[in-house]
Amino acid sequence: MYTLKQDRPHPVPPPPPLTMDHLQHGYSTNTPVTLPGIPEAARSVSTVYEGRIYSLDVVQQPIRARMCGFGDKDRRPLTPPPCIRLIVRDATTQKEIDINEIDTSFYVLTVDLWNAEGTSEVNLVRHSATSPSISTATSSAYPPPANIMPFPQYAQTHGYPQTAYPPYYGGQPGYNPHAGYQYPQGGPDPYYPGLPAASTYYPPGTPTQALGPQSALGPHISSASTGMFTRNLIGSLSASAFRLTDPDDKIGVWFVLQDLSVRTEGSFRLKMNFVNVGTQSQAQDQSPGGTPSSPVINVGSAPVLASAFSEVFQVYSAKKFPGVIESTPLSKCFAFQGIKIPIRKDGVKGPRGGQSHGSKGQDGEGEDWENEG
């Protein structure tokens, strides 16, 4: 009989995996790198397109807002209003292009609501039809149906902030721009079949009956949840470009999101996507007279040229809301140029305590406002 030796050494365990600090600097540039303190999913993305580099700079970040619930009469906008500057640089010289050389006629910025980690959309919120209280609301990470978006769904990109090939805001590269949308049959309204109101809809691929346990949303939606989905972020979810001058007297291309509200409380981020929905070859199209032809709307797919996340902002309930943010110099500067931004008064009162100028209004907490422009 043979006996095992008790003093036999144990097998040497495998070495632990190397961290980013131990990797050599010669690794492939196609590997995404996560910066300390910045979630990889929440990083900005810029693209090189037709010899130009497009990027977004969220100059004025949203800080807080009061939740507006599921009614449509008590809208509470984010404060301060997000202001995003578009930066266009030459791909060869890396210098910013003069604004007079940029045609912003069809520049559009769209906005979505994301969770605080920047990992998933929370554009939809579900609430019970029988108990429409705020406590029954739950956010959903499922995106809205593709056939009700102003543009088709675009492909998400990850990796380095600057990529040579932009994602397409019309689907994958095989998308047929002439195929058109396929609307569901048998409904009175192709966008909202069988629904009484346009602000409420069922998730994609779901019949108009109550959601069952085998619905396309996954196993976590049970038959007991007969609620309906509605948008959590409401208001103007897209904005056109404006040529505005900042407080430093520098003109630029700006997008102002002054009409955004959130239905439920919590911590969120905004994701902004910049798209040029005009013809992409308008600079090369020449009329018989030798002058550039006027830009026209792009009937096909359009690439997402840049995207950016806002910082985390907080949405409070009515009891916990600390109040609106004081009007910033940037908001006042843009309001003076005609942008409809509600400006908080600085204690200037007229006769009998009334306002000396501007339209009178209150935000519900006794705060006086005046609407410029």
From Swiss-Prot:
GO terms for cellular component: cytoplasm; nucleus. Disruption phenotype: Leads to predominant production of large tuberculate spores with severe viability defects. Component of the velvet transcription factor complex that controls sexual/asexual developmental ratio in response to light, promoting sexual development in the darkness while stimulating asexual sporulation under illumination. The velvet complex acts as a global regulator for secondary metabolite gene expression. Component of the RYP2-RYP3 heterodimeric complex that plays a dual role in activating genes associated with spore maturation and repressing certain development-associated genes. Residues 1-10 have a biased composition (Basic and acidic residues). Signal peptide: none annotated. Component of the heterotrimeric velvet complex composed of LAE1, VEL1 and VEL2; VEL1A acting as a bridging protein between LAE1 and VEL2. Forms a heterodimeric complex with VOS1; the formation of the VEL2-VOS1 complex is light-dependent. Residues 1-26, 344-373 are annotated as: Disordered. This is Velvet complex subunit RYP3.
